[in-house]
Design a protein with these regions (language model features):
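Helix-loop-helix connectors at the membrane interface of multi-pass transporters/channels
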Residues: 31, 100-117, 207-208, 288-315
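Hydrophobic, small-residue-rich membrane helices and short re-entrant helix-turn-helix hairpins
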Residues: 135-146, 179-182, 202-231, 248-261, ...
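Hydrophobic, membrane-embedded alpha-helices of multi-pass small-molecule transporters
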Residues: 10-20, 161-166, 175-242, 275-287, ...
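TM-loop-TM module centered on a large, flexible mid-protein loop between adjacent transmembrane helices
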Residues: 68-73, 234-285, 337
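Membrane-water interface regions at transmembrane-helix termini and the short interhelical loops
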Residues: 62-71, 126-147, 208-211, 321-333, ...
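Membrane-interface loop-to-helix entry segments
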Residues: 132-162, 335-347, 367-375
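Select transmembrane alpha-helical segments in multipass membrane proteins
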Residues: 6-14, 40, 77-90, 120-124, ...
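A generic transmembrane alpha-helix motif of multi-pass inner-membrane proteins
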Residues: 165, 362-438
Length: 438
């Protein structure tokens, strides 16, 4: 029992640390500053779209066998493979991991060495990532036993200072659109995209520790999920509160990274800034290690060993290093249109997969993906157009904004279930041959 509890805590800490990356440090304080006295609404939405859905995704994939390919398998095997590959690339070498290296430089290194070039920071950062991830079996232990406790201690010091500060003042806001803002801000962490893939990493580690029975594995996964969620919810809430408590003195239009640095410096002074920098380093490092490992394991799995884990790691880290030189804000802006499109699809698949045994037809999944995908595609194209100074599909995007639940950022919910219902009825009437995938 003691071994199982210890293993649950270690793996839970590791999962928390992998999820809790650069984006997770940057976005909650930003929500707090912009929401002011209504920070709780925005934070609740953020908690739903990130840790809650992410942990649910991990649990669902574990129940389906532990492979990310099981998400979307009932739409079509090729769709499942393509979706998983896209998610791996987004959370790996394209957006999430490069952002960890860029954040380490902008939040920590530049604070003390303003003239230090980005490439030196990235070279050292990704050198460490390569060193740890190259030894695949040591990844979860390295994160859970050593890096996470250090990270939590640093964050604890910051949290205490934020909570006990005597002169906390909250900006007055009307609360309009804060739930939608908080929900969609959670997209940027990309945790929901990575959750199905991380489930495989966690399941592999659980098996390595000697838990071979499926029931024991699921119980372990459930406990790991509870530990990770509790830590994530606590940390996010306190970070958001920290921002809200200083919302009258911080410019809400400032860059997210600069906003975080200012909050901590005001709370703890120069020593606090140093602590925050170290927290960023550890948060970014643990996330980069976890996601890079996931990328290597995924491509080794789908290629049936033809693409080795170590070769994938070498290429992935090299690409991450190059893209990290773009910078945090540029990476965030580039990610918005893509995430706007793919997140509704992923959330729809996770929700339906949670009740997989009660969904009789494969086409029900297809209908849900079509409904969510159309809304996400229109909004993604419009968002990209606006970033480029245009307004392509602006009228259609405005019309979608009138859909039920749009004020909560959930305008895709009704089209998703409508699509699922239409395709279910069509299947029941026509009764086409049901596809069965192993």
């Amino acid at each position: 029992m003691k071994k199982k509890l210890l293993d649950t805590i270690i793996i839970g800490f590791a999962l928390f640390a992998i999820f809790f990356g650069a984006g997770n440090l940057i976005f909650p304080p930003y929500l707090g500053v912009t929401a002011g006295e209504n920070w709780g609404i925005a934070t609740l939405a953020f908690l739903i779209s990130d840790p809650l859905l992410s942990i649910i995704a991990v649990m669902v994939v574990a129940a389906l066998g532990g492979s990310a390919l099981n998400v979307g398998r009932r739409v079509h095997p090729l769709f499942a493979s393509a979706l998983a590959a896209i998610c791996v690339l987004l959370i790996g070498p394209i957006f999430a991991v490069p952002r960890t290296g860029a954040s380490t430089h902008e939040i920590f290194v530049q604070s003390y060495f303003p003239s230090a070039p980005q490439w030196i920071t990235s070279l050292v950062f990704f050198g460490i990532v390569l060193w740890i991830t190259y030894k695949e079996n040591s990844v979860m232990d390295a994160i859970g036993k050593y890096l996470t406790p250090i990270l939590l201690f640093i964050l604890f010091c910051i949290f205490v200072a934020a909570i006990v500060q005597p002169d906390a003042t909250f900006a007055t806001t009307d609360g309009t659109g804060l739930f939608a803002q908080g929900f969609k801000e959670g997209y940027q962490t990309m945790d929901v995209l990575g959750a199905p893939l991380l489930a495989g990493v966690v399941m592999k580690d659980i098996t390595r520790r000697g838990y071979l029975n499926k029931k024991d594995q699921f119980r372990m996964m459930f406990g790991v999920g509870i530990v990770a969620f509790a830590l994530l919810a606590l940390v996010y809430s306190t970070l958001a509160y920290s921002g809200a408590s200083m919302s009258t003195v911080i410019d809400s239009t400032a860059q997210r990274a600069a906003m975080l640095t200012t909050i901590v410096k005001n709370l703890l002074g120069s020593w606090g800034q140093l602590a925050m920098g170290l927290a960023v380093c550890f948060a970014c490092l643990t996330t980069a290690i976890g996601l890079t490992t996931t990328c290597g394991q995924y491509f080794e799995e789908v290629s049936k060993g033809k693409i080795s884990y170590k070769k994938t790691i070498l290429v992935t880290v090299a690409v991450e290093f190059i893209i990290s030189l773009v910078g945090v804000d540029s990476l965030i802006n580039l990610a918005v249109p893509v995430l706007t499109f793919i997140f509704p699809i992923m959330i729809a698949l996770i929700l339906f997969s949670a009740f997989d045994q009660y969904v009789p037809y494969d086409w029900t999944y297809l209908g849900a993906v079509v409904g969510a995908g159309i809304v996400g595609l229109v909004q993604g194209i419009n968002t990209l157009s606006q970033l480029l100074g245009g307004n392509l599909l602006g009228d259609t995007a405005t019309w979608i904004g009138t859909f039920p639940l749009a004020t909560y950022g959930l305008e895709w919910i009704v089209p998703t279930f409508a699509g699922a219902l239409i395709f279910t009825i069509a299947t029941a009437i026509v009764k086409p041959k049901q596809l069965e995938f192993d």
